[in-house]
Amino acid sequence: MHWTPEHAQPLNQWPEQHLDVSSTTPSPAHKLELPPGGRQRCHYAWAHDDISALTASNLLKRYAEKYSGVLDSPYERPGLGSYGDAAFLNGAKADPEPWPGPEPPYPLASLHEGLPGAKPAGAGGSAGLGGSPVVAGNLTEPLYTGNACGGPSAATEYAAGYGGGYLASGYCAQTSAALAPPPPAALLQPAPPPGYGPSAPLYNYPAAGYAAQPGYGALPPPAAPPAPYLPSGLAAPTPLPAPAPAPPRPAPYGFPGAAEGVSLKRKAVDEGAEARYRKYAYEPAKAPAADGAAYPAADDAECRGNGFRAKPPGTTEDGTGKYGGGGSLKVLGSPAYAPQLEPFDKFAERVPAAHGGFAEPSGEPAKGVDPGTLELVSSKMVDCGPPVQWADVAGQGALKAALEEELLWPLLRPPACPGSARPPRTVLFFGPRGCGKALLGRCLATRLGATLLRLRGAGLATSGAVEGARLLQAAFAAARCRPPAVLLISELDALLPARDDGASLRAPLLTCLDGGCGARADGVLVVGTTSRPAALDEATRRRFALRFYVALPDGAARGQILQRALAQQGCVLSERELAALVQGTQGFSGGELGQLCQQAAAEAGLSGLQRPLSYKEVEAALAKVGPRAPPKELDSLVEWDKMYGSGH
């Protein structure tokens, strides 16, 4: 039988509507005990095709209706209403005919008498089934009526879950009045031990719960089991008091002594690795020094800008107290080009080699150079501007990556490039005017933590051949005396005229490039810039190991440059206005975009006014400022890059 939501219908219709009789192989738990004679004859006739499947189904259905009449007994259900007498006049219950068969009907009890609330429970307590309180509430006092098998008879009142189909084969259905009823449940319980009494207290825990323990103390004791689970007559043990809260744990990150040297050493290695790679990320620009000198003179006490500090000559590193003894941890990192680096206890101090990276300076003064000229170069040519990071250069993403891979990494990490015998010491930037070639040179000096010296080729050319050669030699000598150093020579094509009439600086430049960047020039990087690379002869071109083309800024870079320049004028444009400006400034260089913003501010007369710049004023200035690089010049630069450029 299956339970369906239509249980509110008359009970005498349940077997008729919900009894599945079409199955010929039901499970033992659900098979009905139909009369064996008629059922066997029906199955025999159906198996031999004497009757059709429809006839067999009708016969089995009639047998089921006859048999289900035994289950239709009146059932009083308090609290849910009762059924009227007319509801039981129809169906199989109103059939007074006895069941025909060779065996008498089994005296089965109604299935509804075991439901909760059908009859009041007796006061005899729990009996049988282990004294379960659930079964005891549904059984009456005369529970065990004897039978021939020594167990409860089929007429015994069970709970709702127990049906006739679930009885074991050992249970007999015949009743027997000869057996006496079993003793009450109280007599079946064992006697308690002598040390226990019913007057002992049970679990007496407060109902309000436990107070919160501070910190991470011990867990509260488990809740007491309910009374029905305790055997009657056995006293529960006295509950243990709650343990005292654990003391607060000390701070997890401290600087203990030598006992935790291993963990602190591992932490120091991790910090060194993190600081080692942080230098090559695109970080924001750092604040300049208090005295305004972003690239100070290189001495033994100054930091090189890459996380290393020089060690005084003649001193040794004290290994004790490096990781223990309460001393503070030192900043660790990989070797960089700086004099007298601090040795790491895991690696020996690197000896400068002619094929490695930037080596330590000799400390000897430059020979063959006027001291006055050297002092003039040191005071006038050293760039003291703010440091420039990669984020300050708009666009040029591929060029930045190529410089990191082909120039900065070989210079700062010589062991990481075993294939190259010597890292490059010269680089040439060529491209249209105002594209940020000098800005890239300043950024290289910042990334290397080097002193920046700047020379203008046009200024050296106008000073004459003799004076220009003297200044050029003094600049290279000053760079060798102040390693690590970056010597930036802008407008390199001005030093190399088309005709070698004796007034050019080609020969002194080649001599300085060979000597200043030769085997004795460790720690010097020469950066040249030009907008006319075709003016360089083959000898000068071969002196520069790396040659990179700095193209005009793309749309995203132009938008970034315009936003920065207009923000200085107090102008904030919408996205649509900025997109219109970016589209209208195609072919502009970075310098020309800056001139556009200055022209708009000058026309608006913002020198003494507080009114911000508007889009109309910038649009009016756009009609007067345009790109200066002709397409023919751009095509020639692209062709020269294909022939002689390093590519990126």
Curated annotation (Swiss-Prot):
Cofactor(s) for this UniProt protein: Mg(2+)
Reaction equation(s) it catalyzes: ATP + H2O = ADP + phosphate + H(+)
Annotated binding of ATP, by residue: 394, 434-439
Keyword Kinase in record: no
GO MF: ATP binding; ATP hydrolysis activity; microtubule severing ATPase activity
EC number(s) per entry: 3.6.4.-
Keyword line: ATP-binding, Cytoplasm, Hydrolase, Nucleotide-binding
SMART domains membership: AAA (SM00382)
UniProt-annotated location(s): Cytoplasm, Cell cortex
Organism domain of life: Eukaryota
GO BP terms, alphabetized: microtubule severing; morphogenesis of a branching structure; negative regulation of axon regeneration; negative regulation of cell migration; negative regulation of wound healing, spreading of epidermal cells
Record InterPro entries: AAA+_ATPase, ATPase_AAA_core, MT-severing_AAA_ATPase, P-loop_NTPase
Family that this chain belongs to: Belongs to the AAA ATPase family.
Protein name per UniProt: Fidgetin-like protein 2
Gene that this sequence comes from: Fignl2
Pfam families reported in the protein's UniProt record: AAA
